[in-house]
């Protein structure tokens, strides 16, 4: 049986909560805006080494910091430095977590040995930004429950939700525990994130993964980011949306395992 330990650690910017399992080379997991750290649970048993799932700012027991991806990255980097002393782990993020991972590679390169960016980009194009303003308004007026239907249609494809109503129920239960303030602050951070001028500085080898049905961070965003990064490759997963590790755990692991092994 896999043993999972839940912990928290104090950093100069605040407290960070996380869980870990396994031994060996460290792999840090950063969840998306629309999920929590448990969003990687379906694939953790098949991931190599020591796997560390981190709560992003305002999620779990992690303290909220200023609403910028750079500040999010600085908080998580401080935790990683303590959790993985003397090591530059692979950092894998999904959605919000992928932007934080990219921010770590830019601002704290000594703490990132490799990157797996699942649903990411350098910035959001103007047509995509009203979605964040809409989600902010929904949460501020109706709470997390008001944004849950929107979130579900971004996490999964419509066809998958139609065939797996139990997944919608489970995700809805998870999202009900999301702090509305944390959600809104994360949306504000994503509204203004822009790594187009700094992404070229990333020296870590990078795998960019995107579902071809991802409405939150479409394949065009992944390809635009790939054009900026010096050591990256893009993998497009068919018939998957924003959280492929939830929708097709085995297919997701198949897509990333060689990269994680260093190939």
Which residue stretches match the model-derived regions?
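Short beta-strand/loop motif that positions the catalytic acidic residue
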Residues: 202, 208-210, 214
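Catalytic histidine neighborhood in serine/cysteine hydrolases
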Residues: 226-243
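Active-site loop/oxyanion-hole signature of alpha/beta-hydrolase fold enzymes
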Residues: 41-45, 52-92, 254
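Gly/Ala-rich beta-loop-alpha elbow adjacent to hydrolase catalytic centers
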Residues: 93, 97, 101
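Conserved alpha/beta-hydrolase catalytic His-Asp/Glu region
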Residues: 126-130, 144-200
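Flexible "cap/lid" loop of the alpha/beta hydrolase fold
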Residues: 102, 106-107, 111-142
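Conserved HGGG/HGGXW glycine-rich cap/lid loop of the alpha/beta-hydrolase fold
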Residues: 14-63
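Catalytic histidine-centered segment of alpha/beta-hydrolase-like enzymes
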Residues: 240-253
